């Protein structure tokens, strides 16, 4: 065996690499790391996947994806296993999850958890089941745990139609969710929410404690690394349902949804808060148009929000903002169809750390 030094490897023209065959050894001043693991887990991160959705009377299994660091229209990713709406979404650095939901047109409350490999394209795979079946749940995660909170279980649910339950699972191992604790405020709130590596948030939602549905502005905070109940963190700037958020490691950006009665699908308000500091959210700017239920995901720089509904139409718009600044959203591109997206999942969000 002999040693040799290589500073650069090209073909004869100098515009491409060459192949090295057989058994070879290399030395270098900065070292070399050989890729390991399955090829589906290699490559750069920063992809966001929008999980199905609906535009009544049609319901979709289709998923779209974007590369968050660029701009442009979304591309087809694959399909969920069932037509459903009002599911929650969360993600690890490799997998995106769709949690629960409502089966259309079957009219069935769903407990299943499906997952995709974010760096690839294709269909979903079965992961396990929720601890308690629900739709209108909201999802969030750090690098190890996926959680969902709130929800609507229907009149036969042992936890009541509107739920305050928090559920969790380990994202590295297939299996069912377990009970985590309770929210401070009972409500339903579907979609996806941002997080830090330790804290998850549920902002806004719809509550029926008085016998008549009302929209709320409360923010609950959950410490994801432990088990236990949420605490009250503060308020967003308006009562709303259908709010979604995304984050870097320190700041949460919240796209507000539908306003209170008379039903207003026209809240184009974006809020933000510093996740380490308890308190109320502040105004960030405006979305490019007025709509509700536009799930978001992020990388370390940008948050993107896709789809949504106004009254009476549906949107395929994707907005983005730079998380560390304030200001109005900018047009990113379009989804492949106009719809309310169930949830979103990304492999570089703030809850994953670096």
Please name every model-derived segment.
Residues 2-354:
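Polar, enzyme-active/binding microenvironments
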């Amino acid at each position: 065996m002999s040693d040799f030094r290589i500073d650069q490897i090209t073909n004869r023209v100098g515009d491409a690499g060459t192949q090295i065959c057989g058994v070879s050894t290399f030395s270098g001043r900065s070292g070399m790391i050989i890729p390991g693991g399955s090829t589906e887990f290699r490559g750069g991160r920063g992809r966001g996947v929008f999980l199905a959705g609906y535009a009544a009377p049609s319901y979709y299994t289709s998923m779209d994806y974007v590369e968050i660091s660029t701009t442009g229209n979304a591309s087809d990713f694959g399909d969920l296993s069932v037509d459903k709406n009002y599911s929650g979404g969360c993600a690890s650095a490799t997998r995106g999850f769709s949690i629960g939901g409502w089966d259309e047109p079957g009219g069935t409350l769903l407990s299943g958890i499906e997952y995709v490999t974010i760096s690839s394209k294709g269909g979903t795979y079965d992961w396990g089941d929720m601890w308690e079946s629900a739709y209108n749940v909201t999802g969030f995660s750090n690098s190890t745990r996926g959680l969902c909170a709130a929800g609507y279980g229907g009149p036969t649910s042992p936890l009541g139609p509107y739920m305050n339950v928090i559920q969790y699972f380990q994202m590295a191992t297939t299996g069912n969710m377990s009970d985590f604790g309770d929210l401070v405020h009972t409500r339903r709130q579907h979609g996806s929410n941002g997080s830090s590596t330790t804290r998850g948030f549920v902002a806004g939602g719809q509550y029926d404690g008085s016998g008549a549905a009302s929209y709320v502005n409360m923010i609950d905070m959950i410490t994801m690394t432990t088990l236990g109940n949420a605490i009250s963190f503060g308020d967003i700037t308006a009562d709303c349902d259908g709010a979604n958020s995304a984050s870097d490691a320190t700041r949460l950006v919240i796209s507000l949804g539908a306003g209170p009665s008379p039903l207003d699908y026209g809240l184009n308000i974006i809020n933000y808060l510093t996740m380490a500091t308890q308190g109320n959210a502040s105004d960030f700017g405006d979305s490019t148009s007025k709509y509700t239920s536009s799930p978001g995901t992020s990388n370390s720089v940008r948050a993107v929000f896709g789809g949504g509904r106004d009254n009476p139409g549906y949107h395929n718009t994707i907005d983005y903002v730079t998380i560390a600044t304030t200001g109005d959203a900018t047009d990113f591109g379009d989804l492949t169809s106009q719809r309310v997206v169930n949830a979103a999942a990304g492999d570089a969000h703030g809850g994953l750390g670096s």
